[in-house]
């Protein structure tokens, strides 16, 4: 409830390098790019997520937005700190995404 949200350059750099405008994920898979504005709103996405999956020390939040969805992954370092790891967007319904299906299956 009173956990501290931490975001650092490593998480921002990872999200932009892997899922930003010039990333292979965007160029080759037609994934919508992540922007600095998206990253600045990640806490709102987490707070208003349609679904959140907790696995080991990872927390993965899914938010459906119009014709695409946003995924935010955080690491729970301890009971009171959540560190931004990455975020990405994909077209379609998050429940049909391979990432979601994998996380649900591994969570059982």
Residue ranges and their predicted role:
Residues 1-108:
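Ribonuclease/tRNase effector modules and their secretory precursors
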